[in-house]
């Protein structure tokens, strides 16, 4: 229950917490990607940030173009300040859509990707030493699947899962797929 305080009108927030909560705050800062850039922080603190320079028009254009490309509405397109921010947001959304459901990560993950899942999205099972039909069996067995996460290619092994093989099992369970 650390206090959150708005700083100015630039959508920048400061979290002040006791040293007891510092490890949790640091883990959030380190793994989620939801942090302000040093350039934005400097401009905000000095009062030199221009609201028109915050990119609202550019974000609207990007949302509109992505929505048209994927045949969805612009409201369905979520933009994040960083790749890790997007991974955090996708995992959080998966947890809200399928609370308590099983989560699986296929192939070797980037450390922070796995940490986001473990720390902020619940328990996740990591499978790296199997492939193809074995992945299908892992997905099909057990509790209903909430989300499957993978990286293409995996880092550092540069492997890619066989989506043609696993997607029918994921769809059958109603699970979400998150691909980085």
Give the label of every model feature segment:
Residues 1-85, 93, 106-120, 125, ...:
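Conserved N-terminal alpha-helix of the aminotransferase class I/II PLP-enzyme fold
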């Amino acid at each position: 229950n650390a206090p959150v305080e708005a700083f100015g009108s630039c959508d920048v927030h400061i979290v002040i917490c006791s040293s007891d909560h510092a490890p949790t705050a640091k883990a959030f800062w380190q793994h989620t990607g939801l942090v302000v850039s040093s350039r934005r922080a400097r401009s905000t603190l000095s009062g030199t940030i221009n609201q028109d320079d915050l990119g609202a028009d550019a974000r609207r254009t990007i949302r509109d173009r992505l929505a048209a490309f994927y045949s969805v509405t612009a409201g369905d397109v979520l933009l994040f300040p960083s790749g890790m921010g997007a991974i955090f947001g996708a995992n959080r959304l998966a947890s809200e859509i399928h609370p308590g459901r099983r989560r699986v990560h296929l192939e070797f993950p980037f450390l922070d990707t796995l940490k986001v899942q473990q720390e902020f999205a619940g328990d996740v099972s990591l499978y790296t030493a199997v492939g193809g039909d074995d992945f299908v069996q892992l997905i099909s067995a057990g509790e209903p699947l909430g989300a499957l996460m993978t990286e293409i290619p995996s880092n550092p092994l540069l492997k890619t899962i066989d989506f043609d093989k696993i997607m029918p099992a994921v769809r059958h369970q109603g699970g979400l797929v998150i691909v980085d």
